[in-house]
Amino acid sequence: IFADFFAGSGVDSRLARQNGYRVIANDWEPYSHALNHAILACTEAPAFKELGGYQKAIDYLNRLPEVKGWVTHNLCPRNDEIYDPSLDRLFFKRRNGMRIDAIRQQIATWQAQGAIDDVEMSALLAPLLYSASFVSNTSGVFKSFHHGWGGKTQTALERIESLLWLTPSRFSEVGDNKQKNPMAEMWCVDAQHLANQMSSFEVDVAYLDPP
């Protein structure tokens, strides 16, 4: 058993999964659960029976028209060309903000309609989170944004101005041996609470990499 108490993006849990461990991945940040739920639990794409398959669902989301929603109103400037960093928030270009809103709203609609289950929703949220991070006007931390597109040197301008585009997730790669295909479980709780829940059994590796 590999217990990852602060899983974050899940890179260490994925490596453990690939090496045959049963994985317990935890992080109290909801984004981590969204990233890791499907990627760790599945060895192939979920069925997406109601939507005609995973790739068709991704293609549909990429073709959606732009929508002004929460991200556009709260994380984008009023105008990409004329803005005031003391008043406007410059996390995303407006076009990408509207794409994020459109895609997230459609995923929520599918969930409300019962067209996707929790694992399938995770398989859609993960590429949205990754692609949104790629086009963000930040240096990787969302506590602040560059005061101007790309920062002082504008070295990241090409990335920030690129079109947000979803690519399918890659799921856990495990060996053919059934013993190499252990289950994985995801938690979204305080690390101490998880440790208390696990007090009745031992783990092979307890990985703690707190923020």
Language model features: what each stretch is:
Residues 1-2, 15-21, 58-67, 83-87, ...:
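Phosphate-binding glycine-rich loops and adjacent basic patches that engage nucleotide phosphates
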Residues 1-53:
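Conserved S-adenosyl-L-methionine
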Residues 31, 36-99, 106:
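Conserved phosphoryl-transfer catalytic core
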